[in-house]
Structure formats: structure tokens, C-alpha cells
């Protein structure tokens, strides 16, 4: 079921990959184009930066992060331990990615337990 949900994310306009990483377990699941490895190290660094920023009381906890440009990336916290990453190329529609994630986040959380 988790692979099916991730496949749906990777089929979104402009998306190439969707994967879940965990602090404890590393790469949990991944779906994407052949020959393209998930950017686990890059995503982990972003998540760690979000956690450091969240230690500032004025900012609060970061639940989502996205970048747009030649490469697009959406990082969504699923739990304290796990995060979902959707990545792709220029021309992706972050708003559609975010909406799709929002619709399936509860299902993903239940599968992660």
C-alpha cells in the first residue's frame, strides 16, 4: 500500500521520485524513475536544518519545506521520526504535490506505525 501511495506521488506533474526516510531506519521506501537514486543525504541535511531552526522558540517546529528552481523538492514531516520527500524537475506544481500529500498523510502515518 505504501508503494502504491508513493507511486501516485511520483506520477504527479513534474515529480520524478517519492520516498520516505526515517532518522532511525534511513530509507524506508522509494518509488521513482529507473537509474535515479533518492537524494537521502540531501534530504537528511534539510530535515536536520529544519530541526535546528525549530529549536528557536520564535520560529517553532517546521512541518514542511519546499524549494523551486531547476530541481524541485518537497519535504513533509510525517512524524517525529519519518519524513516524506517528493522531488522533480522544473515545471512541477508544488501546490498539487502538497495537496496530494495532505490527502494521503493520515494513511501514510497509519502504515508507518
Residue ranges with predicted function:
Residues 1-17, 23-113:
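Acidic, low-complexity cytosolic segments
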Amino acid at each position: 500500500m505504501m508503494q502504491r501511495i508513493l507511486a501516485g506521488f511520483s506520477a504527479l506533474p513534474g515529480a520524478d521520485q517519492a520516498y520516505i526516510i526515517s532518522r532511525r531506519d534511513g530509507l524506508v521506501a522509494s518509488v521513482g524513475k529507473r537509474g535515479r537514486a533518492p537524494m537521502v543525504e540531501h534530504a537528511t541535511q534539510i530535515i536536520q536544518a529544519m530541526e535546528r531552526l525549530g529549536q528557536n522558540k520564535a520560529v517553532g517546529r517546521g512541518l514542511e519545506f519546499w524549494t523551486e528552481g531547476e530541481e524541485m523538492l518537497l519535504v513533509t514531516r510525517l512524524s517525529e521520526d519519518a519524513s516524506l520527500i517528493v522531488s522533480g524537475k522544473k515545471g512541477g506544481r508544488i501546490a498539487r504535490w502538497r495537496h496530494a500529500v495532505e490527502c494521503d498523510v493520515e494513511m501514510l502515518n497509519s502504515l508507518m506505525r
